[in-house]
UniProtKB/Swiss-Prot annotation:
PANTHER family: 40S RIBOSOMAL PROTEIN S15A. It comes from Mycoplasma pneumoniae (strain ATCC 29342 / M129 / Subtype 1) (Mycoplasmoides pneumoniae). One of its GO terms (molecular function) is structural constituent of ribosome. The lineage of its organism: Bacteria, Bacillati, Mycoplasmatota, Mycoplasmoidales, Mycoplasmoidaceae. This is Small ribosomal subunit protein uS8. The gene is rpsH. Keywords: Ribonucleoprotein, Ribosomal protein, RNA-binding, rRNA-binding. One of its GO terms (biological process) is translation.
């Protein structure tokens, strides 16, 4: 099992930080990734586990009790092909992208998911359409 050993650094854009770590781990075929936890990151990881893109995740308390750490395991097939083929951040700190539920995008014609931040919390585009809620498009995962 391969794990990351680099020191954990805070990032000003938690979505970009998480997506970059997922993408780099996917390309390097790492099993386990560790990052600083936030409510938004945990909500995104819950969606990715529920949709089958990640195996699992665990939130741990840091030894100094100042910051929580989240560790997650990427999911691979028996041939070591990652379940996540790609991730793309859509809404960024300098340019937020909001859409009503009628105009929420289909990622790869429904084969991927869009992660949406709504007034009811973070959810996939499919759930947002069912609830008829629009929101900020955080990322695409396929």
């Amino acid at each position: 099992m391969i794990t990351t050993t680099k020191p954990i650094k805070a990032h000003f854009d938690p979505v970009a930080d998480l997506l970059t770590k997922i993408n780099n781990a996917r390309k390097a075929k790492l099993m386990t990734v560790t990052t600083i936890a936030s409510k938004l990151k945990i909500a995104i990881l819950e969606i990715l586990v529920k949709e089958g893109y990640l195996a699992n995740f665990q939130v741990l308390e840091n030894k100094s009790k100042t910051k929580r750490i989240v560790t997650f395991n990427l999911k691979y097939t028996q041939r070591r092909i990652p379940s996540i083929n790609g991730v793309k951040q859509i809404s960024k700190p300098g340019l937020r992208i909001y859409r009503p539920f009628e105009k929420l995008p289909l990622v790869l014609n429904g084969l991927g998911i869009a992660i949406i931040s709504t007034s009811d919390g973070v959810m996939t585009d499919k759930v947002a359409r069912l609830k008829k809620i629009g929101g900020e498009i955080l990322a695409y995962v396929w």
